[in-house]
Amino acid sequence: MEKVIIIGAGPAGLTAAIELLKNGGDYDVTILEGSQAMGGISQTVRYNGNRMDIGGHRFFSKNQQVMDWWADLMPLQGKPAYDDKKLGHEKPLAENGPDPETEDNVMLVRDRVSRIYYNKHFFDYPISMKPETIKNMGFVTTMKAGFSYLWACVFKKPETNLENFYINRFGKVLYSMFFEGYTEKLWGRHPSEISADWGSQRVKGLSITALLKDMFKKVFGTKNKGEVETSLIEQFWYPKYGPGQLWETAAEKVKELGGKILTGCQVKKIMCEGRKVTSVVCDTAEGEKTFTGDIFISSMPVKDLILGMDGTKPCDTIIKIAEGLPYRDFVTVGLLVNKLNLKNETNKTTLGNIVPDCWIYVQDKGVKLGRIQIFNNWSPYMVEKPEDTVWIGLEYFCAEGDDFWNMSEEDCVKFATAELVKMGVISENEVLDSHREKVKKAYPAYFDTYKHFDTMIKFLDTFPNLYCVGRNGQHRYNNMDHSMLTAMETAEAIKTGKKSRKDIWNVNTEKEYHEEKSGN
């Protein structure tokens, strides 16, 4: 029986374990997780009766294997959720599916509403060509945006950076209004300094043309799931108690199948002999512990993996690339408030008539805040009193060790509250409770030595018993389903003896990957 060591109990690590162990898989699997939580950045934090989704995670994939995998762990609702029942909303229901009012292990169907908040006006996210958009932008700006887009269609810029990538798809005016400032908040760099790879992996086929096509297909009813850009979906699945609930369920599945999960095990060293990993050394509450194995699956940051290699040291070139790999860190501030000052002027009804958004993207350059999550709208079960209070998450992008990261929790909450008051989102005396969470290396970034990452991949592929999976494991800003697919490809390669890592690294690198794999 081959011994498999998996580093990290996030979506990729847990998926890899289940894929290896299911159907009587003859593997001795151990997952080493540095924290006490399951799901990595997809975990759910519980605080004073309310729950926080750290980054906001929609359960949607163009890959049917992933959708089936989720549904197998957490069946789709068969009866309406609390808010849908109260408000008379109709949702697709699974025959004989669980009732979320009486059962916990249930996947909800939720409406996707995400908008941009810019200059105290709401705009659709992604930008749409609705009369309301034109009204909020003003006639002159709308005309400028239209001519700017036509100019961009005729005079294409070389896509050598993210700025040109966006301008080619939206024109200079819309880029300046809705992409430039937010991107700089997210990465701490101007888009002209960032590789276009990020756009191709996160935005993919999204453009003004795609938005117009989507509107046309909506009118004439010709859309199917395989054709819809992820940024354009209108409904998604969501666990009753947030994404962490599904990954906690996945962890229990790993144990049922005979796998082991050890928490509080922070991998610090990767011991190598030649081009073979032999063991990993972890810091634990009881001191250092060593875990030997035949196969190693890593979802830890590539920088930490390379700099932690011992026994056989990587060459100077690889070490320099690893040292220069950039990351963006993340702080989220949860605020429990009596009400929001934002008016619900949509045709969507909500509990307490709050705005219906799951996410609000904050484009104003005068505040540091990047996004607002409204947890009531993700799932009413995330909030202890969903009709009387609003539980929001304020998302900030920063660098570990900078002034914002080092703020005390009290000062951070005051700062976040002041920004919301400045924007007119809340009144100062409305805050009832608060909580802060900090996440290191939340976003692998696409600048500095990232341009040499192909060299890193070639080096990592020289280790026949080492597989890199997931967002940080591949230094790729993947969605949750992409991270899972890297793990599924890895498990398949291990089970079949396939030596090439090409399919593992290629997940989410080409626009049509999911359509090709799922046959949509």
Where are these regions (language model features)?
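Glycine-rich FAD pyrophosphate-binding loop
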Residues: 21-47
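Mid-domain catalytic core of redox enzymes
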Residues: 23, 239, 265-410, 414-424, ...
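Conserved Rossmann-like nucleotide-cofactor binding loop
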Residues: 12, 37, 303
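Active-site/ligand-binding neighborhood in enzyme catalytic cores
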Residues: 131-133, 137-273, 278, 292
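C-terminal lid/capping helical subdomain adjacent to the catalytic/cofactor pocket in oxidative enzymes
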Residues: 437-440, 447-520
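N-terminal Rossmann-like FAD-binding beta1-loop-alpha1 element of flavoenzymes
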Residues: 2-31
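Conserved mid-domain beta->alpha element of the FAD-binding
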Residues: 156, 294, 298-305, 403-409, ...
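Dinucleotide-binding Rossmann-like beta1-alpha1 core, especially the glycine-rich loop
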Residues: 48-153, 204
